[in-house]
Amino acid sequence: MYEMSGIDSLFHDRVVHDYSHTSEQVIVVYISSAAGDNSWLHQWFKPGNLSDEERENILWVRLVNGTKECLLFKSIFPSSSAPSINILQNGLLECSIQGNSLSREQDPWETFINGLQSVFKGQVTKRKLFSKSNEEYQRVKRMIQNDKLERKYVFQNTNDPQRKPQKWKQLTVTDNVSYKSQKGFLAQNYCTLQLKLPNGYTISNTFPPQTKLHKVRMWLDYNCYDDGTPYLFHRNIPRVTLTRNDELKSLQELDLLPRSTLILEPLEANNKTFDYMEQSSLLHKVYSGLTSFWAKEPEVDASSSRLGYQRLGTNVSNSANYSLQKLSSLDMVSDGGGGGGGDSMTPSAYTTPRMYPSNGTSQLRQNVSELNLSSNNSASNTKVRTLGYSNNNGNN
């Protein structure tokens, strides 16, 4: 009799509207076969074993089979039948105990309690996660409020005329390596130029910082460039074209240290700007006199005719095997000798890509003063530069 009164007092025939706001609340729906028929539930259900928390936190609903509410419930959950008891949470069916599907070995009450525990565990986990997220939210909110108060305090003190100005000690960041000293050391020792030729080749070489730019032009003309087209040096960063007056300056004066890239810009034969610059510049006349003296072709030495050197841009008629290789040692064009004076050429340990016969002699001199230029070969219509070198017999 106690159990009957407990079941009748536990389940509600209609859902109270006050419970509609509890979307996450656990709902237990009991579907009876007929009105007032609780015989199936009395066989196993033990309302006295429920705790007060389960009684208060769970919404207990009873539906009669065939009623409008029961038909609506079955349309949402077609698997439910009469008699049955169903556990819902968040609109999902978590556990269902059907009266006709239970076996004798299966205890309905144990199944019901296990279903409630699994649902409550999920609720506890969600509550913990929600509490943690809420704590984090509150912490961030407090930090924002404190930051606002701090900025407000600083702003008020700044506008206060009676407030004494506070001197802040500026922090200086020091490093073990001084950039200026390192830059000065690199600038005093070498200047690496990367030269981009009009034919697509890119070569690089290292020069002393006091080398004039016209010496770089001479080194380039005698070693790499033989197109015959006049050209000027163009600097990409900053975008500037170096004139003939600039070529009388050193690499250090042109701010090309420690490394820079120069692009060769070919000029057309009828370029008026180039012709006007050549005719009107007094410095160019001096430069032309100097270059005409250096560019005079000496006579061909028979002892040096064994080493053939093909420069870039020439028309080679024969099919000689030329390969792009790196030399083990190159010379640099210099305006200062080993002692800091004179006009001698100082050897360099840096290597530069060079095009030369694959079976040629490994010894190669790059200094302009040591180059012997042969005349054009009329038989093969091939322009070949022959480099002079010192053989073992001592002949030049």
Swiss-Prot record:
Residues 382-396 have a biased composition (Polar residues). Residues 333-361, 374-396 are annotated as: Disordered. GO terms for cellular component: endoplasmic reticulum; nucleus. InterPro entries: Ubiquitin-like_domsf, UBX_dom. GO terms for biological process: ERAD pathway; sporulation resulting in formation of a cellular spore; ubiquitin-dependent protein catabolic process. Residues 186-264 form the UBX domain. The modification Phosphoserine is found at S369. The keyword Phosphoprotein applies. SUPFAM superfamilies: Ubiquitin-like. Involved in CDC48-dependent protein degradation through the ubiquitin/proteasome pathway. Present with 1340 molecules/cell in log phase SD medium. This is UBX domain-containing protein 6. The gene is UBX6.
